[in-house]
């Protein structure tokens, strides 16, 4: 196996002048090419000009669209029959206050009421009156579940009156009959107290009297 051994260092003194002149010529050529390839100064300004032109075009388009929309909305409002009818109806009626300089008499200051508003006000008043009358009548017609009908009390009161009349007519009756009547009255009062419902919030005075007697 053969091994070739040589010097690893190069003698720079052996470089000829021709070799030194080559890099100079190459560098000069590269510099010319760089100068030839450099963009002109006008190309940078052309970008700004195109953007300004685009902005001007956008402004013109938006202004034309806004004018078209305004003209369309105005024509649409004029063509609507509702607005025309309302404007014709409220001509001269939108003043809520009268002018004192134009008024010659006190009668001119009075606001003229239209018959439609007057009729509407009367109808509303009649409806409210009917509702109030119906509500007041319903108070008496409604049945309170906590209250007991007064039929039993009325019957007992009538019987008491009858017994009193009999006592007036029979002044000459004996003491036995009066005792019997008293017993009947006691039974009726006890029966009446039994019929009337006694709740926690309401008590009858007769029940307390009976308790005291007992």
UniProtKB/Swiss-Prot annotation:
GO terms for biological process: positive regulation of DNA-templated transcription; response to cadmium ion; response to oxidative stress; response to zinc ion. A motif (Nuclear localization signal) lies at residues 117-125. Residues 176-207 are annotated as: Kinase-inducible domain (KID). Keywords: Nucleus, Stress response, Transcription, Transcription regulation. Residues 51-60, 165-176 have a biased composition (Acidic residues). InterPro entries: OxStress_Response_Reg. The keyword Transcription regulation applies. Residues 1-66, 159-193 are annotated as: Disordered. GO terms for cellular component: nucleus. It is found in: Nucleus. Probable transcription factor. Promotes slightly the tolerance to cadmium (Cd) and zinc (Zn) and to oxidizing chemicals (e.g. diamide and tert-butyl hydroperoxide (t-BOOH)). This is Protein OXIDATIVE STRESS 3 LIKE 5. The lineage of its organism: Eukaryota, Viridiplantae, Streptophyta, Embryophyta, Tracheophyta.
């Amino acid at each position: 196996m053969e091994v070739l051994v040589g010097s690893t260092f190069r003698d720079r003194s052996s470089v000829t002048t021709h070799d030194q002149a080559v890099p100079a010529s190459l560098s000069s050529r590269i510099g010319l090419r760089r100068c030839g390839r450099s963009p002109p100064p006008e190309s940078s300004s052309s970008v700004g000009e195109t953007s300004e032109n685009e902005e001007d075009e956008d402004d013109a388009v938006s202004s034309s669209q806004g004018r078209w929309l305004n003209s369309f909305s105005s024509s649409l409002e004029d063509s609507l029959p509702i607005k025309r009818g309302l404007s014709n109806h409220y001509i001269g009626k939108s003043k809520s206050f009268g002018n004192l300089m134009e008024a010659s008499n006190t009668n001119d200051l009075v606001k003229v009421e239209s018959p439609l508003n007057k009729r509407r006000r009367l109808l509303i008043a009649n409806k409210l009156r009917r509702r109030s009358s119906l509500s007041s009548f319903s108070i008496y017609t409604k049945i309170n579940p906590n209250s007991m009908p007064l039929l039993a009390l009325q019957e007992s009161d009538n019987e008491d009156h009858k017994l009193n009349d009999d006592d007036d007519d029979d002044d000459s009756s004996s003491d036995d009959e009066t005792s019997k009547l008293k017993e009947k009255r006691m039974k009726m009062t006890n029966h009446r107290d039994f019929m009337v419902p006694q709740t926690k919030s309401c008590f009858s005075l007769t029940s307390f009297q009976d308790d005291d007697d007992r």
